[in-house]
């Protein structure tokens, strides 16, 4: 029987995929075949001609490839998987079955999501620049308990939190020590990709500080956005300072770190308008947000220390990181099952498209200037040499 025959192709691929992703072993071969049938090309598997490995590597490490991904392509009035994502999966399947792609190479560059039944590129976060900034080795390492979640198709917060208990504990302890040395008032910013766990760790930090009798407040960066109509008219990207009432933002951070009460813009997320005009003045009828002085002030946002001009004002800069496969499983549970937030195929396209782009423009740059990185998947706390020296003395 030809390896391209549907039954034989599925049999060989199933065997190899169980080694690439242990969760495949929880599927019966016929269930695997059901899922695979959705990706069979019109001309059959023999019609797929795999590209050279070096060409694929170059493609998936080029931002232009991700810019070209469509998140809402339609066929017969329904959203379908982007053709580039589909073709990548088909080539990897065929390359595995024929032996043109060895399992180690596929595992190194890609991960397979069972629930979405597609391949995604593994995003590299710890670049040479980041590693040099952090002194080349973790400050502390623990058992990698997220490995216990490899066979899960989706992950809830309870099991995620349990897997991260040790590294979260040392993070909280380390931040408390840094605050004791650097003093208050202090700005604390936690950045990280979607579903990495940053919202939950911030809530836990806040609770710890309040239990210790410290006054805590927060500044939400999105409140400094200018009107969306203006940004769209000017083609302004929302990650840049041009999208913000930046002078107000900078002055607000300066003032609150000196114990002053601040009045900041209020952004209306329904109408996408700011309480302030482009000159930073309160509009007629606008209502600002008043923030009282505090010991610890969280900056809420995805890129709190991406803006070079305010980095020096942020007393503690943390990146909370979780690898893409775990984050994707968290989002299946949180955003699809619980929140019913996305149409599933739209979600697959969007997650595939966004991770490389966001790592390149937001997270790796922040990792290169932060004080600490929590790698929950690697179960390690990374710090700069300066911070490591402080923590060793306290």
Specify the residue positions occupied by each region the protein language model found.
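Small-molecule kinase domains that catalyze NTP-dependent phosphoryl transfer to phosphate-bearing small molecules
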Residues: 75, 79-100, 104-109, 339-386
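ATP-dependent NMP and nucleoside kinases share a basic, alpha-helical "lid"
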Residues: 282-337
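Conserved lysine of the Walker
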Residues: 198
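Post-Walker A alpha-helix
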Residues: 201-202, 206
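P-loop (Walker A) phosphate-binding loop of NTP-binding proteins
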Residues: 193
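Conserved nucleotide-sensing/catalytic segment adjacent to the nucleotide-binding pocket
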Residues: 217-279
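Long, basic/Gly/Ser/Thr-rich N-terminal segments
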Residues: 1-160
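N-terminal pre-Walker A segment at the start of P-loop NTPase domains
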Residues: 153-179
């Amino acid at each position: 029987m030809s390896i391209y025959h549907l039954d034989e192709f599925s049999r060989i691929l199933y065997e190899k995929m169980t080694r690439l992703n242990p969760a495949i072993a929880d599927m019966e071969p016929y269930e695997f075949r059901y899922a695979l049938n959705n990706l069979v090309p019109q001309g059959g598997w023999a019609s797929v001609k795999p590209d050279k490995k070096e060409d694929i590597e170059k493609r998936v490490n080029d931002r232009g490839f991700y810019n070209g991904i469509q998140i809402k392509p339609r066929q017969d009035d329904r959203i379908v998987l982007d053709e580039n994502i589909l073709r990548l999966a088909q080539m990897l399947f065929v390359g595995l079955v024929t032996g043109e792609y060895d399992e180690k190479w596929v595992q190194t560059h890609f991960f397979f999501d069972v629930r979405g039944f597609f391949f995604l590129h593994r995003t590299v976060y710890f670049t040479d620049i980041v590693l040099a900034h952090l002194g080349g080795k973790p400050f502390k390492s623990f058992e990698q308990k997220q490995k216990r979640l490899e066979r899960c198709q989706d992950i809830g917060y309870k099991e995620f939190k349990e897997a991260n208990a040790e590294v979260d504990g040392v993070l909280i302890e380390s931040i408390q020590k840094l605050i004791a040395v650097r003093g208050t008032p202090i700005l604390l910013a936690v950045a990280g990709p979607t579903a990495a766990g940053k919202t939950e760790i911030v809530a836990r930090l806040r609770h710890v500080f309040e239990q210790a009798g410290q006054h805590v407040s927060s500044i939400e960066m999105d409140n400094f956005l200018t009107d969306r109509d203006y940004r769209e008219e000017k083609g302004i990207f929302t990650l840049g300072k041009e999208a913000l009432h930046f002078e107000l933002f900078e002055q607000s951070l300066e003032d609150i770190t000196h114990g002053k009460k601040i009045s900041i813009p209020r952004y209306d997320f329904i109408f996408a308008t700011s309480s302030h005009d482009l000159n930073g003045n309160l509009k007629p009828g606008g209502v600002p947000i008043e923030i009282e002085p505090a010991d610890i002030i969280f900056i809420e946002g995805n890129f709190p220390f991406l803006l070079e001009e305010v980095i020096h004002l942020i007393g503690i800069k943390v990146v909370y990181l979780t690898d893409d496969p775990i984050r994707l499983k968290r989002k299946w549970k949180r955003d699809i099952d619980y929140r019913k937030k996305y149409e599933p195929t739209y979600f697959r396209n969007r997650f595939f498209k966004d991770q490389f782009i966001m790592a390149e423009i937001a997270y790796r740059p922040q990792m290169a200037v932060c004080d600490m990185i929590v790698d929950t998947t690697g179960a390690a706390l990374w710090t700069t040499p300066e911070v490591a020296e402080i923590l060793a003395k306290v």
